[in-house]
Amino acid sequence: MTETWNFINTGSKDPYYNMAMDEALLNFVSRGEIDPVIRFYTWNPATLSIGYFQRLQKEIDIDKVKEKGFGLVRRQTGGRGVLHDKELTYSVIVPESHPNMPSTVTEAYRVISQGLLEGFKNLGFDTYFAVPKTPEERQKLKQPRSSVCFDAPSWYELVVEGRKIAGSAQTRQKGVILQHGSILQDIDIDELFDMFIYKNERLKLKMKEAFVEKAVAINDISDEHITISQMEEAFEKGFKKGLNIELKPLELTEAQLAEVEELTEKYRSDEWMFRK
């Protein structure tokens, strides 16, 4: 019998709400209030999100982010900086105890990302999992050279034509797995690299050139322009097939929505943003 999970598309929201909703959904699943959930969302304004462990003032040019009119938010997941602009963002929230969820982070990535793999197939892309094969490649995962996400595939992230096409991060809290990530529709590499601090311009240029070789957006390799709504349809079907589930619409209660609003203030606060 096929299991049924929740599905919610919260549309285009500000960065604080987006991160608050992910944390709130994790809380609701942890408390047993809702079944596992898949969420889709986009960002308004375009936002630079940084990983939980990143050093904001050492790695990010905050004035440049403000000058461009972008949002800035710290995630509760690890990883590096991501510019959320022309993309579909997804979250998967599921108990660690779920029978289909492996105990290790990398294997759970593989299971959850099967939904992404099927979504890319639905859009006509020959996509596969990146699995670092050599000790050198595995060491690079532990010591990334840049603050920018997408500049190298990590375990079981998705690659098409040798370049990373979806970047994801995972956290485990309160007995629950939260994996969220970006599915790039288009990317402006100059905009992205302008927001990070480098020792010198030569290093910045070198990193940018390496990034172009290693990362790609859907419309860079598609013969036809693919819209966000087409992506939503493809990946909703992809998660159903990849995880062997059905999806039902999730409607949150007034009390649950109030919890989201309360958490929004946490992500808006300087205390959270400048914690590292």
From Swiss-Prot:
The record's InterPro entries line, in alphabetical order, gives: aa-tRNA-synth_II/BPL/LPL, BPL_LPL_catalytic, LipM, Octanoyltrans_LipM/LipL
A single GO BP term for this record reads: protein modification process
**Which parts of the sequence belong to the BPL/LPL catalytic domain?**
32-247
Describe the function of this protein: Catalyzes the transfer of endogenously produced octanoic acid from octanoyl-acyl-carrier-protein onto the lipoyl domain of GcvH, an intermediate carrier during protein lipoylation.
HAMAP family annotated for this entry?
Answer: LipM
Q: Which family does it belong to?
A: Belongs to the octanoyltransferase LipM family.
Question: What is this protein's record name?
Answer: Octanoyltransferase LipM
* Gene source species: Staphylococcus aureus (strain NCTC 8325 / PS 47)
Q: Which gene encodes it?
A: lipM
